[in-house]
Amino acid sequence: MQLLELKQNIRTKTREDIDEQQREYFLQQQIKNIKEELGNGEGSPEYHELEKAAKNKKWPEEVAKVFYKELDKLEMFNPQSPEFSVQLNYLQTMINLPWNEYTKDNLDLKRAQKVLDHDHYGMEKVKERILEYMAVLKLRGDLKSPIICLYGPPGVGKTSLGKSIAAAMKRKYVRMSLGGLHDESEIRGHRRTYVGAMPGRIIKSIQKAGSSNPVFILDEIDKVTQNTVNGDPSSALLEVLDPEQNNAFHDNYLDVDFDLSKVLFIATANDLNTIPRPLLDRMELIEVSGYITEEKIEIAKRHLIPNEIENTGLNEDGHKPQFNKAAIEKIIEQYTRESGVRQLEKQINKALRKLALIKARDGELPYDKITPSQTEDLLGKPPFYRDIYQGNAYAGVVTGLAWTSVGGEILFIETSLSKGKAGKLTLTGNLGDVMKESAVIALEYVKAHIDSLGVDYRIFEQWNIHIHVPEGATPKDGPSAGITIATSIASALTQRKVRKNTAMTGEITLRGKVLPVGGIKEKILAAKRAGITDIIMCKDNKKDIDEIPAIYLKGVEFHYVENVQDVWDFALTDEIVSHPVKFTIEEESHRQD
């Protein structure tokens, strides 16, 4: 009985298995016939192309699983349907990304140094940092890429340096402009549930580069819009620029992680104040300062003039125009006002275009060598004149040093006194709140130490003080004019001359202590352009001077101070101006009962 029961069970199970197989076969045949009727028989050509391409990819196992799962979905769609197109775009994006595909680095340090020096003049700190990275990569063999931020005034070569670094290392180069970026999805991409969804610009740039370790320039990172209704793009960049997180960057469109840890990110910025602090902390900051006139002349000779001669076609017959040094210097000082060389390049191009017009019309160049007198024929009258020291003939006029996002410049602080019972302080010159506060602090210090100047205190009760900073259309702010304002007030009160060819920069406190300020190199360049020979600054700024190459310091003597009295001891001479103002003090009348 047991044997018969066993046979019956086996027979039943076998029949069920056969029925199931027949059912599956029947269903598969039906699906096949339906696909053939719809024109999608043995899989679409796109399906087979993707399947073939996938065999050569070196992607992670998790990514492969997602890809093949999505590929199976593609097979189910009609090629004429919108879903097929959406799915195909997604799969093509995945297949075109360079998963674990890297270009081989050329780690020849001597060659890299030559490439960087050939393409860019100066920039020693940046070049040194790139060579350090290459050296460690050469010794260790594997290294997370640094996140570098180059900041400085416009036109100094921050963006173009990225191409040179890529050429030096033989890596792919890609650039992404962040100026005006206001939507987080531009970085992270859109989810595929949205119509017209696509990956973010980071993933698209990597796809364009065709390598997982390109040199990636994030241009104008300080111009990213913050806290918008479409999400905060600067917050999305935190994941991209964090070495601890970017090995698994998550794009909303891909919905899988992509490794960005081998990408050499180089951000550029003009002003660090507009970059959010968390983003700033993730980057290694390297300052790219402006150029002095001698450096600009060298850059013009080596790069700008040869490039523009080629661009204007003036080298076709081998008869090239030449600029002498004095002509280049005149263009720099009277036709441009910048720390970089962008405007210089435009002026050189403008001059050569004029020559190209003459040559095309007359058949020959009017002159082979361009001199200072001929620059006006080509460029017109100079729009600028050198910021020059204006002498010390007037009391109350002191030269200060300022720093803006486009470089350094000199400014003049003027103080005058006028008869008035209120003893009022007036500030003009489009000054910001911080600079106004500096003026108030400077005046209060002078009042507290009026005896050291030998002036009657009652002058503040009977004379008004007016402080003005020329070029009123230009906004001015910051605390660094503190010692300049204090010296200007002291000079106006005593009618003593200020030492010749002297400028100063430094913040002051109510106690008269001088505090360090920033932008020292840019301020030194501005002082040199103006013919200043002596600069007064805080003693704590000496460390900044020690880091500046000697070529920038040539011809300038520095005087380090700790308090305002030190400033006055050096800056105020014993000589009275030619036509001093006589401050009369009226005695108070007492009525007797």
Question: Which sequence ranges carry the predicted segments?
Answer:
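Peripheral, non-AAA+ core regions of ATP-driven protein-machinery
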Residues: 367, 390, 394, 398-399, ...
